[in-house]
């Protein structure tokens, strides 16, 4: 959520920055709501002033032995009018809050202009795509051996965009997640956290998935207002809800492996085969909570930490800076990591690392205590995939495939795979 002070004091600047990301803010509606809010606030103050004055007059009348009942009747009527105006004010505040919740974050000044992923800017590449003396196969074909990648069984259980993994592929999937967690906890200083996979609606409001992306969420039917997590970012960031963290305890660095559940609304016809776009997938998520002045340094750090996974697995990739029009709703700046897939002869997204500045923190009131002032201030929140496990498995299968269809085990994974060289 944007700072209301910025909206009120520098509306034209906000409108212009939002326009960079293709969002047209209805400034007329904002001004109307703001005027109504001010009018209601003034009306409440006026009623309160009149009531206080009448209360004093009643006291004086009683001290003089005069009949206070006419004045008390007037106070009673004022109280009724005050309650009505307070209810009106709450209605206006709710409309104002709903209006704010629909506004995305402002892009950082360093974010390049652009309308879509076609305008994203490549920052760097690492590694060279492998050369094959045979035509490389798609991961779905490679997984057909011994039926280890079974989409038919998954469809029988759950429908399209699910997969059943068996045997060595299931083990490789588990090994990748364990490798990522060990790297981030042992070398990158993250605290591992096990979190619920069902969260309250307010958690999704807190991180920005709601209200705009409701159709992309899986909501649990029943009396309890639960949603399946679309990303580990949601429960991890919400751990700081309504907290005030002392400065020496910062930064907070949390990592979790969670399943992610997405309806993929709007993705009809995209990546219908294989494991690239699924309703359920595993992801290792990195989250940092930092002091505002350190957040862009933290963004570079979290991106490098996600890159380290790909480097240790020797998977070719590139880093792309997202243009303003391709930014996620809550992000002020984002880097995507894209891994090379030989069967597609192109790079595909495998991680997204974002600085949300104080956008999420304002929604969940995640704060730190500034030792200089002694007062609580909003934190900056960052998140990054470190990495999406299924897509990493796809990349390993395709980049390490052999002519006979077997997959060579990356050196970094051998200890997690029982020391075997191929699977």
From Swiss-Prot:
Which amino acid positions bind L-serine, per UniProt?
231-233, 285, 385
**Notes concerning its domains:** Consists of two distinct domains, a catalytic core and a N-terminal extension that is involved in tRNA binding.
Q: Which UniProt keywords apply?
A: Aminoacyl-tRNA synthetase, ATP-binding, Cytoplasm, Ligase, Nucleotide-binding, Protein biosynthesis
The subunit field of the Swiss-Prot or TrEMBL record says: Homodimer. The tRNA molecule binds across the dimer.
List the GO biological process terms: selenocysteine biosynthetic process; seryl-tRNA aminoacylation
Q: What class of enzyme is it?
A: ligase
Which Enzyme Commission numbers does its entry carry?
A: 6.1.1.11
- Grouped into one coarse class, the protein's main location is cytoplasm
Q: Which GO terms describe its molecular function?
A: ATP binding; serine-tRNA ligase activity
The source's superkingdom equals Bacteria
Q: List the disulfide bonds.
A: none
Q: What PROSITE patterns does its record include? A: AA_TRNA_LIGASE_II (PS50862)
Its recorded reaction(s) are:
tRNA(Ser) + L-serine + ATP = L-seryl-tRNA(Ser) + AMP + diphosphate + H(+); tRNA(Sec) + L-serine + ATP = L-seryl-tRNA(Sec) + AMP + diphosphate + H(+)
Q: What's this protein's name? A: Serine--tRNA ligase
Q: What does this protein do?
A: Catalyzes the attachment of serine to tRNA(Ser). Is also able to aminoacylate tRNA(Sec) with serine, to form the misacylated tRNA L-seryl-tRNA(Sec), which will be further converted into selenocysteinyl-tRNA(Sec).
- Compartment list: Cytoplasm
Q: Which InterPro entries match?
A: aa-tRNA-synt_IIb (IPR002314), aa-tRNA-synth_II (IPR006195), aa-tRNA-synth_II/BPL/LPL (IPR045864), Ser-tRNA-ligase_type_1 (IPR002317), Ser-tRNA-synth_1_N (IPR015866), SerRS_1_N_sf (IPR042103), SerRS_core (IPR033729), tRNA-bd_arm (IPR010978)
Its pathway, per UniProt, is: Aminoacyl-tRNA biosynthesis; selenocysteinyl-tRNA(Sec) biosynthesis; L-seryl-tRNA(Sec) from L-serine and tRNA(Sec): step 1/1
């Amino acid at each position: 959520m944007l700072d209301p002070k910025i909206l009120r004091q520098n509306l034209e600047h906000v409108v212009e920055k939002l326009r960079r990301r293709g969002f047209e803010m209805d400034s007329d509606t904002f001004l109307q709501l703001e005027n109504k809010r001010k009018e209601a606030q003034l009306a409440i103050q006026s009623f309160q002033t009149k009531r206080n004055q009448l209360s004093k007059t009643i006291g004086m009348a009683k001290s003089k032995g005069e009949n206070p009942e006419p004045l008390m009747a007037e106070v009673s009527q004022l109280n009724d009018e005050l309650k009505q105006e307070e209810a009106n004010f709450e209605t206006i505040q709710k409309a104002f809050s709903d209006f704010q919740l629909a506004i995305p974050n402002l892009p950082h000044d360093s974010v390049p202009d652009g309308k879509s992923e076609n305008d994203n800017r490549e920052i760097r590449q690492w590694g060279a795509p492998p050369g094959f003396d045979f035509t490389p196969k798609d991961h779905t074909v490679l997984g057909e051996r011994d039926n280890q990648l079974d989409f038919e069984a998954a469809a029988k259980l759950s429908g399209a965009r699910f997969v059943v993994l068996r045997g060595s592929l299931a083990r490789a999937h588990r090994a990748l997640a364990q490798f990522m967690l060990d790297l981030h906890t042992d070398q990158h200083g993250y605290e591992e956290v096990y979190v619920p996979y069902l969260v309250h609606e307010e958690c999704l409001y807190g991180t920005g998935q709601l209200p705009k992306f409701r159709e992309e969420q899986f909501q649990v039917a029943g009396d309890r207002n639960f949603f399946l997590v679309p990303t580990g970012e949601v429960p991890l960031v919400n751990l700081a809800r309504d907290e005030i963290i002392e400065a020496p305890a910062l930064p907070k660095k949390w990592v979790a492996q969670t399943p992610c559940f997405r309806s993929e609304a709007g993705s009809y016809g995209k990546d219908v085969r294989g494991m690239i776009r699924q309703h359920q997938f595993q992801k290792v998520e990195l989250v940092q909570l930092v002091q505002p002045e350190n957040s862009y340094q933290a963004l570079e750090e979290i991106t490098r930490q996600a890159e380290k996974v790909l480097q240790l697995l020797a998977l070719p990739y590139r880093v792309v800076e997202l243009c303003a029009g391709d930014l996620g709703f809550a992000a002020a700046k984002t880097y995507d990591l894209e891994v090379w897939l030989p069967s597609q002869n192109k790079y595909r997204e495998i991680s997204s690392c974002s600085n949300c500045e104080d956008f999420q923190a304002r929604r969940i009131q995640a704060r730190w205590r500034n030792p200089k002032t002694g007062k609580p201030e909003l934190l900056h929140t960052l998140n990054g995939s470190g990495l999406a496990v299924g897509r990493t498995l796809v990349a390993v299968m395709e980049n390490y495939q052999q002519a006979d269809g077997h997959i060579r085990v990356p050196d970094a994974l051998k200890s997690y795979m029982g020391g075997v060289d191929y699977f």
